[in-house]
Structure formats: structure tokens, C-alpha cells
Amino acid sequence: MIFKYKDYDIYYEIHGQGDPLLILNGIMMSTKSWAEFIEPMSKDNMLILVDFLGQGQSSKEYEQFYHDIQVDIVEALLQHINIPSVHLFGISYGGEIALQYTLKHPDRVKKLFLSNTCANTSYWLEEVGNAWNEATHSGISYYLTTIPFIYSPKFFINNREWMENRKNILVPLFDNKDFVKSMKVLTNSSVGYDVRDKLDQINVPTMIVGCEYDFVTPFYQQKELNDKIRNSQLVYIHDSGHAIMYEKPSLFTSLVLGFVNNSKIMYNL
């Protein structure tokens, strides 16, 4: 489905009924990335998927923008579908938007789930983004600069056939000049992002997940989130990289649904 935000077409999907769960994509993801997760995540919940500006089936923008427009698109979506509040999940780039949305619209968020994300674009992450941008001259260069480091080394090695299939799909996509131009704008939209001094303003129940081999948003950044967000819990996943949803899909789904659908928050033991 499409709704209009200003002059942009924003694509979204709704699956199932129940307590609403809104999923915010990582930077290279789209609503299609969640195909294998729709069935379990919509069994007891209204699952809401959305492509950010520049992603998937939403409009592309080749002039530079920043996170604030993505935050406003999330709010416009909830107004469009007339949902007063949601459980909000964000992974990586989507987690950054989720944090800013929660700070701006705290009454809209029942629970917050942050996976493999951070409170600021560090010098490290900015240089990673610069490396991605410098590799956009060819599909294979972009693939080799981005994809291997999203996964843990063990997963990458042990799933060579799966990775080669992904490579065959992604390299032609990364050769598309409009795609990589849009990706550069998305990557640069995170420059200057920093909410570290605002994290103590978040009061909603929050689950934070970090992984042992996350080379994009290292675990110390999830630890920082946990240290500064009151009423937050931190889960450390061994033997996984940045793309936990693909490396450990069953565990990932169990964590999300267990946290979202557990109605008991305080235990007096």
C-alpha cells in the first residue's frame, strides 16, 4: 500500500491483527527483507512494515536529507493508518530512527526494541559509510566492501552457498546507478546523528540486542544505550554479526515477540 508524505510515495504493509508492532528497516533493507518473518510476527500482532524514503518501493530522493524526515514519515504513517501507539522495533539505521521517534513522540511507543544500533554516528561508523560510498563505482566493489562485514566470519564461511546466491542477486542491484545513488544519500543521512545526551529521557520499557561479531555497530554501543536508557535490558548474542535476523532467525523472532507480548513488566520475587 502507498500513502503520500508531501510529494513522496511511502510504501507500507499491514499483516494480521492484534497489538501493533512496527518494524523499522536497516539501511540496506526493505519490506521484502521481512518475508520469512511475517507469519510468526503477525500471528498474534498487527505487523506493520514500511520502506523509508529511499528504500524499497518508496520514492527515491537524490538530494541530501537527514534522519528528521524519516522520523516524520513514521509519524505520518501512524496518523494515516490511525494507530495511536505501537511496539516499536528498529534494527541498525531503523534503530536510530526508532530512538529519535521515541524521544519526539514518547506517548506513541508502548515498548522499544533496539537491535544492533547506536546512539550516534561515531568516527568509526562515519568512515565505514565513507568506504561504502567510495565503492559505488561498481557492483562487485560495493558488495565486497559492504556485505562480508555485515555477517560474522563463521556464518559467512559456513553458509558459502547461501552467500554466493546473495552475491548473484545483489551485485546486479549494486550495479544500478540509481540504487547506489540513493544508498549514498541514505548513508550520508546519518552524518551528525547523536542522541547520547538525550537517552535518559526515554522511559518506555526497552530491549537492546548486541552481537559478538558486529563490525558495524560494535557491542560497546549497545552497552552505552543500556547504561543510559532507564528501564532497559541488554542481550548479548554470541557467534552473530550485525545481521542477526539472518544468522539466528529463530532466536531473533523469539526475543522480539517474547519482549513485545509479555504483559508483565515488574516481577516482585
Language model segments and positions:
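Acidic catalytic loop of the alpha/beta-hydrolase fold
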Residues: 212-217
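Catalytic active-site module of serine/aspartate enzymes centered on a nucleophile-bearing elbow/loop
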Residues: 232-269
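Conserved alpha/beta-hydrolase catalytic His-Asp/Glu region
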Residues: 123-125, 143-198
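Active-site loop/oxyanion-hole signature of alpha/beta-hydrolase fold enzymes
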Residues: 48-89, 254
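Gly/Ala-rich beta-loop-alpha elbow adjacent to hydrolase catalytic centers
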Residues: 90, 94, 98
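Conserved HGGG/HGGXW glycine-rich cap/lid loop of the alpha/beta-hydrolase fold
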Residues: 7-60
